């Protein structure tokens, strides 16, 4: 599967697969299964989201994440085009990327990522 381009934009684009390490001086979120870095705390937008299997966080950008094909899903906030995202290291499905929101009030989610809390842990400097 192609990697998900972590930059802004509505499309999941193939990119070179590699493992990124976030600076140790930053509070980070990592995959609970393999400890691959996923996101910096500074990229967290909201803690008030619901994933398929429980609470989830919305991030502006992520690393070490690949994505599947986009599909339309009727979510709690309306119809969206989303692509499942997975950890590039252990291949665990983590959540999804919002490709397109069909309701004007939900457009802010486009290009953003949902990661379920059950699939991530806090690392570095949370004391």
From Swiss-Prot:
- Residues bearing Phosphotyrosine are 98
Query: Which Cys pairs are S-S linked?
Result: none
Tissue and organ expression note: Widely expressed. Detected adult brain, lung, colon, small intestine and ovary, and in fetal brain, lung, liver and spleen.
**For the Yippee domain, which residue ranges apply?**
27-124
According to its UniProt entry, the protein's GO biological process terms are: negative regulation of erythrocyte clearance; negative regulation of erythrocyte differentiation; protein localization to plasma membrane; regulation of cell shape
Keyword Transferase appears in the UniProt entry = no
Modified residue Phosphothreonine is at which positions?
A: 92-93
The subcellular localization recorded is:
Nucleus, Nucleolus
Tell me the InterPro entries matching this sequence. Answer: Yippee, Yippee/Mis18/Cereblon, Yippee_fam
Q: List the record's Gene Ontology CC terms alphabetically.
A: nucleolus
Write one Gene Ontology MF term: metal ion binding
Record: residues binding Zn(2+): 31, 34, 87, 90
Name the keywords, alphabetized: Metal-binding, Nucleus, Phosphoprotein, Zinc
Positions of transmembrane segments: none
Q: Which family does it belong to?
A: Belongs to the yippee family.
**Protein name, entry field:** Protein yippee-like 4
Q: Which gene encodes it?
A: YPEL4
């Amino acid at each position: 599967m192609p990697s998900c381009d972590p930059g802004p934009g509505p499309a999941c684009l193939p990119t070179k697969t590699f493992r990124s390490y976030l600076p140790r001086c930053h509070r980070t979120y990592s995959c609970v299964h393999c400890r691959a870095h996923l996101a910096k705390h500074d990229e967290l937008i909201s803690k008030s989201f619901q994933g398929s299997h429980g609470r989830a966080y919305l991030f502006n950008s992520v690393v070490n994440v690949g994505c599947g094909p986009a599909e339309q899903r009727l979510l709690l906030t309306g119809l969206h085009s989303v692509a499942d995202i997975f950890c590039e290291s252990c291949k665990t499905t983590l959540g999804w990327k919002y490709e397109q929101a069909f309701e004007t009030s939900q457009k802010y989610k486009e290009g953003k990522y949902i990661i379920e809390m059950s699939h991530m842990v806090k690392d570095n400097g949370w004391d």
